[in-house]
Amino acid sequence: MFVKKGDKVRVIAGKDKGVEAVVLKALPKVNKVIVEGVAIIKKHQKPNSENPQGAIVEKEAPIHASNVQVLDKNGVAGRVGYKFVDGKKVRYNKKSGEVLD
């Protein structure tokens, strides 16, 4: 999976298209990511001893990894490629050529 936790990304599809934010969690088994402030859903919580009234909580839902592009240090969004630098495999931005790792 080309996106990692902590990467700054731009959403390229969906209702939050154009938003730039940080990846909170990567879910490689299902090829999805949770991005801060993107795809907000309302989750109903049952009443419990901590919250006897119950609640409606807003949280981020996972979005497919193909709907985001990783930003480099200069804020250029592009596809991610892999190459070897000094015998170490690193990710790089294919548009700008800048190393991401």
From Swiss-Prot:
Xref: Pfam families: KOW, ribosomal_L24
Single GO MF descriptor: structural constituent of ribosome
GO biological process terms, semicolon-separated: translation
Keyword rRNA-binding annotated: yes
Alphabetized SMART domains for the sequence: KOW
Record InterPro entries: KOW, Rib_uL2_dom2, Ribosomal_uL24, Ribosomal_uL24_CS, Ribosomal_uL24_KOW, Translation_prot_SH3-like_sf
UniProt keyword annotations, A-Z: Ribonucleoprotein, Ribosomal protein, RNA-binding, rRNA-binding
Subunit and partners: Part of the 50S ribosomal subunit.
Name of the protein: Large ribosomal subunit protein uL24
Gene name per UniProt: rplX
